[in-house]
Design a protein with these regions (language model features):
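Long, hydrophobic/aromatic-enriched structural stretches that serve as scaffold segments
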Residues: 60-98
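Short glycine-rich, low-complexity/disordered patches
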Residues: 124-134, 227-238
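A structured, charge-rich N-terminal accessory region that forms the first stable segment of a protein
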Residues: 2-76
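Aromatic- and glycine-enriched beta-alpha-beta binding-site module
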Residues: 82-154
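Short coil/turn motifs at helix boundaries and re-entrant loops, enriched in small/polar
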Residues: 108-109, 211-215, 221
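Aromatic/basic-lined ligand-recognition segments
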Residues: 137-201
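Acidic/histidine-enriched, beta-strand-rich ligand/metal-binding domains
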Residues: 205-208
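A short acidic-Thr-Gly-centered motif at the start of a beta-strand
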Residues: 96, 201-203
Length: 238
């Protein structure tokens, strides 16, 4: 971390990170271009083998969605991204983070290369390119990176102190919190032991849908004008 040892709360919110109708797929495991309409229930089949493959595909997609929402490690990562046709809207070059189907978070190469200079632990960035399902050709030569952010650490303190967070019980009977409104700078309390954290990017399982960013990574993102989509606010160390 940098000399100020600050910590920043961030979230891949739809207010700053746009969703695009893009399918993540693993071409080594499924022939997605050939069978995607069956996988996505656009076409029916009575073929037992295809029905079994469709079932596995759905299970993998469900796990991928859970990994993005709850920040756990998954082996079912895509090696390609697919759009239905050349008319499908693609992210503009000004967006360095975007979301795809299954809740996947995808970064541009420039943003991914910056993150790779920092301590990500077991979190991974998998290279993918976008293809057209109609032509099975690349939509562009650009390489993107699919983020599997799976590192978890617990540093949050006094979560019920001022009513900004709402508690609820998860399916696993664990207490978790969601944000009520917007968190202001310095409002969220984080244990000062976070200064010894060996990571620059992690999720705290107590707080749903958010990640934490070290001062060093925050400063690097700001320096290259890649901070706005993260919507980072500083925390207060206690």
């Amino acid at each position: 971390m940098s000399n100020t040892n600050n910590v920043w709360l961030a979230g891949f919110k739809l207010t700053s990170v746009n969703f695009y109708d893009i399918y993540p797929a693993n071409s080594k495991k499924y022939d997605f271009p050939k069978y995607w309409k069956i996988f996505e229930s656009r076409e029916k089949t009575a073929d037992p083998k295809l029905l079994e493959i469709k079932k596995m595909y759905k299970e993998d997609r469900l796990e991928l969605s859970g990994a993005g929402r709850y920040f756990f490690k998954t082996e079912h990562l895509p090696d390609s991204l697919w759009v239905e046709s050349s008319n499908t809207k693609l992210p503009p070059s000004s967006e360095y983070i975007f979301k795809v189907r299954s809740g996947g978070v995808v970064l541009t190469q420039a943003c991914a290369q910056l993150l790779q200079q920092f301590r990500l632990g077991e979190s991974t960035l998998t290279p993918v390119q976008i293809y057209d399902l109609e032509t099975q050709q690349l939509c562009s030569e650009e390489t993107f990176y699919f983020l599997n952010l799976c590192e978890r650490r617990e540093y949050l303190r006094d979560l019920e102190s001022d009513g900004m967070l709402v508690s609820f019980m998860t399916d696993e009977k664990a207490v978790q919190y969601s944000v009520r409104g917007d968190i202001k700078s310095g409002q969220l309390l984080v244990d000062q032991s976070v200064q010894n954290c060996e990571l620059d990017l992690w999720h705290d399982p107590l707080l749903m849908g958010h990640v934490f960013v070290s001062d060093a990574l925050h400063d690097a993102l700001v320096q290259v004008n890649m901070d706005s989509q993260w919507e980072m606010v500083s925390c207060q160390l206690v």
